[in-house]
Amino acid sequence: MDYGYERLQDGNKYLSETVDTDMRNTYSAGIDFSWQATPTSKLFVNSSVNLLAGPGVTATETQVYQGTTTLDGILRARNDYVEQKTLRYSNSLNYLYRPSEKHQLSITADWTRFDGTARCEQPNTYYSATNMLVRSDFFYSQPDKDIDIYALLADYKYKPNDESEWLTGAKTSFIRSHNTFLFEKNGAIDTQRSNTFHYDEGNIEGYTQYTHTLGKLELSAGLRLEYMHTSSKLNAYSSQDGEEHSDSHLRLFPNLSISYALNEQSKVALLYSRRQDKPRYEDLNPFEYLLDELSYWKGNPFLKPQISNKLILSYVWNSLSLNLSYSKLDDYFTSITDALGTTKTVMTTKNIGAQQQVGLEGLFSKRLTPWWDFSANLGLYYFVNKLDYETYKEEYKRPSCLMSVSNSILLPLGLNLELSGRYHSKHQGGSYEVIRPNGSLDIGLSRMWADDRLRLSLLMTDIFHTDRWDNYGHKGALDLTTWFGSESRKVILRLSYSLGKQKFNKVESSLGELDRL
């Protein structure tokens, strides 16, 4: 992939281009086991392992200007990831007890282990405007991450009749993250950048949900009570006394939905939900990852969860559905690029304020003929990002449009043609940046044999190579334009054969902690 930026910082221009080559491979294996001890009870066991490993290289050249036209020097940097490895073990045990149609009890225990390590060698070489060597530095970084996630869930479902259903449950989870980061410059340990970071998180939740149907009216209401405690300790090589931080809070998260069937073809519904989104563990690690000496990424151990409130009014008529929505994020966090001094930039995930969104979405899906399935989606949105953090306060807002179309066409000889496209207009990004228009077009052919167990498919994604992530923005003394293009245009040939039972009736449990890895 290739990416780069042009920035104007305190009146000076920086032009940077990077070629990123990722040579990692993914390996995975898993096993599922089901045992029905009695007609009313079942035991499910799942275990899997996933390994992502291999080298990688980035080559970056940054031109440094005095003002906007006079070239002052060139910085050439190379990130040589001589080792990259992430290993994830997931284990789950589920017991399901269903003595009758009215009662069901489910108990689930989960343990996930995540091990990540990398070794990166990075020479940074400075040249003059006439390409004469000025100086050279050699950086070395070695992050090691160990994360354990333990969770226990219990759900009880009671259905006294066909019109009513109760669901109540409890969940507890514990996360332990131990991280070390070694950073060297020219063979000597940088005691300001090298550190160890410990993070512990405990969660206790209790929840209940009631659903009742009364003729054409359906009502569902729920409440979740969550207690969260976090503690972290950051120890730098240069300090004997670590920096400690802890936080605890107790919060309520209600949800409510009311729907009414106007007739057999149409229905109207109103939905409200409140939830919290917790930061990724990677974003909490205060490690520094250098693109070069002028630009780098850094974690933030002081991130707080963001709180989401969302209201949706929906209408369904035959194959058409319309949704009018409003959402607000408080303590909103996202990755943001800030100026560091007068010559550097740092990208960090921060709680930057609030985000509001109003949206109108339309979805149409229908089998137009016995051989043609068609669906289309159109969304109109208005984003408002209210940045209010540290000493910066500003508001960014912009409308946008998102369109997508999908076709599935049955051809002679049992072939199936799939053609889909997507377009996203210019829109507001996560903070102050504006994303330029982008889109893609995909096409694929497939055929199935042996009672649909054997499948052969040929797919080409992003035919015109237009699925890019280019943006621009302004914040204080920083004007930033960035571009990003990945290997989105691919030709993929897949051959698959399904063995054994096609449907595994396991009770799925929601473990949001895993989504933060």
Regions found by a protein language model. Give the residues of each.
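Outer-membrane beta-barrel translocator domains and adjoining extracellular loop/strand segments
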Residues: 1-12, 56-74, 118-126, 132-133, ...
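Extracellular loop and loop/strand-boundary signature of outer-membrane beta-barrel proteins
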Residues: 14-19, 75-81, 94, 135-142, ...
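Face-selective signature of the C-terminal outer-membrane beta-barrel domain
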Residues: 28-30, 34-52, 80-235, 261, ...
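Outer membrane beta-barrel strand-and-loop segments of large Gram-negative receptors
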Residues: 149-153, 194, 203, 304, ...
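Outer-membrane beta-barrel signature, preferentially recognizing the C-terminal barrel domain
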Residues: 195-201, 247, 276-328, 347-359, ...
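Surface-exposed extracellular loop regions of Gram-negative outer-membrane beta-barrel proteins
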Residues: 229-234, 264-310, 324-344, 463-476
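C-terminal beta-barrel architecture of Gram-negative outer-membrane proteins
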Residues: 383-385, 401-449, 461-464, 472-476
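C-terminal beta-signal and adjacent terminal beta-strands/loops
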Residues: 449-517
